[in-house]
Regions:
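Aliphatic-rich helix starts adjacent to a transmembrane/signal segment
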Residues: 1-5
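Glycine-centered secondary-structure boundary/capping sites
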Residues: 31, 35, 74-78, 139, ...
């Protein structure tokens, strides 16, 4: 009985939704089906008692069944109530793609012949629409796990080692509590990098004029935070932008907001800071940005971001990481369209930063 309660709690906490269905299916496999032979299976979130009663993610499963008296029949009559209790909590997840929009149809989109490989990591879509996620044409996606709040169109084009689930609960914004430091005074001059075959360096600071890197030119960013206040970052195809320990913050006001466009075959090697207020974040979009602001990161196989791309109000078009040399790329945006084949991984221990979603659960009581 205790094994049934333990496994039921772990399964329900890992699933994150349809808790009663998950727990009851598992306990029934142990021979304890709710309502059969006086068995009761009770599922509570949060738990009704114990150290985790105030944890909204904790799941409690109680399996009960009256047992006939044996020797105790000498001292009383009637069956003896026997119960087993278990509590499990979800572990931090291994998500690498999260679409935050709650109603877009779809919030995650992939079509044509594009192939997306999420190496050992999960994809989530918070949209309750049907479809919440679309994999059209002959496009394919491979992941560890796919979980969407709504429905999926093209599920047959998805390969997921640990399953594909619809109707799951929304995943919390992993960077909701992160805010960069106050920005310094801005340089309003437009910066254009034209020198083919040469490297131009840029220091951290605030830039309110556009930054353009033309084909054949290279822009090297020194470590630090770069604020693009109403300014666009434009990296042409066959241009190069590099930097270690950098965060690009796109902000603005009114009708003027920073955005980015990276052309096909641009060479991008940007790595997030491993400490500090923007730890683990390589691109950060202001939460006050108008919903639907367009970002186009379409460098393809030569586009490598090490860290999180966090654009909570952006419609992000993404293509990158084919043959990637980085092992840590997370994409969090309002909506996400894969416009080309991409490889993403989340071996991010060296950079730190927030985990996305849940993966497994562990027993705590």
């Amino acid at each position: 009985m205790q094994s049934a309660a333990d496994s039921g709690a772990v399964s329900a906490a890992s699933a994150g939704s349809n808790l009663n269905v998950e727990a009851n299916a598992v306990t029934a496999a142990y021979g304890y089906a709710n309502g059969v032979n006086n068995v009761t299976v009770t599922v509570n979130q949060p738990p009704s008692t114990g150290n985790f009663a105030t944890n909204p993610q904790a799941v409690e499963v109680i399996v009960g069944q009256p047992q006939p008296r044996l020797l105790s029949a000498l001292f009383g009559t009637g069956p003896v109530p026997i119960a087993a209790r278990a509590v499990a909590v979800p572990n931090a997840g291994t998500g690498c793609v999260l679409a935050l929009n709650s109603g877009a149809s779809p919030a995650v989109n992939l079509s044509g012949t594009n192939k997306v490989n999420l190496i050992g990591c999960n994809l989530y879509s918070n949209s309750s629409a049907n479809p919440s996620m679309n994999v059209g044409g002959s496009a394919t996606i491979a992941a560890n796990y796919v979980g969407v709040v709504g429905g999926i169109s093209g599920a047959s084009n998805i390969t997921a080692t640990n399953g594909i689930r619809t109707g799951v609960r929304p995943v919390a914004d992993p960077y909701a509590s992160v805010s960069p430091p106050a920005q310094p005074s801005c340089n309003s001059a437009k910066i254009v990098v034209n020198a083919a075959g040469k490297t131009t360096s840029l220091d951290p600071g605030c830039y309110s004029g556009s930054i353009t890197v033309n084909a054949g030119a290279t822009l090297k960013l020194s470590p630090g935070i770069y604020y693009l206040d109403g300014a666009s970052l434009n990296v042409a195809g066959n241009a190069t932008i590099t930097g270690t320990g950098v965060t690009l913050v796109f902000t603005g006001s009114g009708s003027s907001w920073g955005t980015a466009s990276i052309g096909s075959n641009a060479i991008v090697n940007l790595t997030a800071p491993s400490s500090g207020p923007t730890q683990g974040i390589v691109i950060y979009g202001d939460r006050k940005m108008p919903a639907g602001t367009a970002f186009n990161l379409a460098g393809g196989g030569t586009q490598n971001f090490a860290g999180a791309i966090y654009l909570p109000k952006a419609n992000l078009s993404f293509s990158g990481g084919n043959g990637t040399t980085t092992s840590c790329t997370k994409v969090v945006a309002d909506t996400i369209t894969f416009t080309g084949s991409s490889n993403l991984q989340v071996n991010c221990s060296a950079l730190g930063g927030a985990a996305i979603g849940i993966s497994t659960a562990q027993l705590v009581e």
